[in-house]
Curated annotation (Swiss-Prot):
The keyword Nucleus does not apply. Residues 1-23 form a transit peptide. One of its GO terms (molecular function) is unfolded protein binding. It is found in: Mitochondrion. Residues 109-223 form the sHSP domain. Disulfide bonds: none annotated. The gene is hspI. It holds the Pfam family HSP20. It comes from Dictyostelium discoideum (Social amoeba). Keywords: Mitochondrion, Stress response, Transit peptide. Transmembrane segments: none annotated. GO terms for biological process: protein complex oligomerization; protein folding; response to heat; response to hydrogen peroxide; response to salt stress. Belongs to the small heat shock protein (HSP20) family. This is Small heat shock protein hspI, mitochondrial. One of its GO terms (cellular component) is mitochondrion.
Length: 223
């Protein structure tokens, strides 16, 4: 157990060496746990050997630092959960998801079919979802709603058969391409599932989801 009076200089000594050299000196590591003649003191009454050299005591402050760091992480997670559930964090997460979808669409390294863009707009009336699905028709798209999730599945298979171009080439070639898209969108609880509408036109899927609060609203005349 280290004394409190020697904890502070040991901390700054270790922090300086680790920060400047990226680790402990080789001399300290090679002599770790070995008391030297200058630092070894023997108690005649008990016969216990003690060393006062703290340069060979690695990772003392690291345990304290990791403990404090984990407490800060727990506090951050608690604040994030409070913000998410109390201040409508779902809409911010939807925005982040839209940004990542755009990045995936722009920087995708795969050739051919790339991840379609998805736009989600929420208002007092309801939710409007727009998905770009080039090369798909309405027969290739399936939409279902379960457990608060709107699931969009699109699958398109194309088979191309190339006939022999000359008498020497008597074997025909066949090429098959597969385009698949799956996405699940978390919807709020105040929506009317029975009034969900989906329209597919020129490779663009538009989904309209009204909210219960807007559908059930009535106008009251003032007399």
């Amino acid at each position: 157990m280290y004394k409190l009076s020697k904890t502070t200089p040991f901390f700054f000594r270790r922090a300086f060496l680790c920060g400047r050299r990226g680790g402990y000196p080789e001399s300290n590591l090679s002599n770790f746990g070995r008391p030297t003649a200058s630092t070894l003191s023997t108690s005649q009454s008990s016969g216990i050997c003690e060393t006062n050299d703290y340069s060979n005591k690695p990772y003392f402050f690291q345990v304290k630092f990791e403990d404090r760091f984990s407490k800060k992480i727990d506090k951050f997670n608690e604040c994030f959960r409070h913000f998410y559930y109390s201040h409508g964090g779902q809409q911010y997460m939807d925005k982040f998801e839209s940004i990542f979808d755009n990045w995936e669409h722009e920087f995708s390294k795969t050739r051919g079919f790339r991840s379609p863009k998805t736009f989600i707009n929420e208002s007092d009336k309801g939710i409007e979802i727009r998905v770009e699905l080039p090369g798909f028709s309405k027969e290739n798209v399936k939409i279902d709603f379960s457990n608060g999730l709107l699931n969009i599945d699109a699958l398109n298979k194309n088979t191309t058969i190339q006939q022999p171009s000359s008498n020497n080439q008597q074997v025909e070639s066949q090429h098959q391409s597969l385009m698949e898209f799956k996405k699940s969108i978390k919807l709020p609880e105040d929506i009317d599932v029975s009034l969900i509408k989906a329209i597919m036109n020129n490779g663009i899927l538009e989904i309209s989801i009204p909210k219960n609060s807007y559908v059930k609203s009535t106008t009251i005349n003032v007399q």
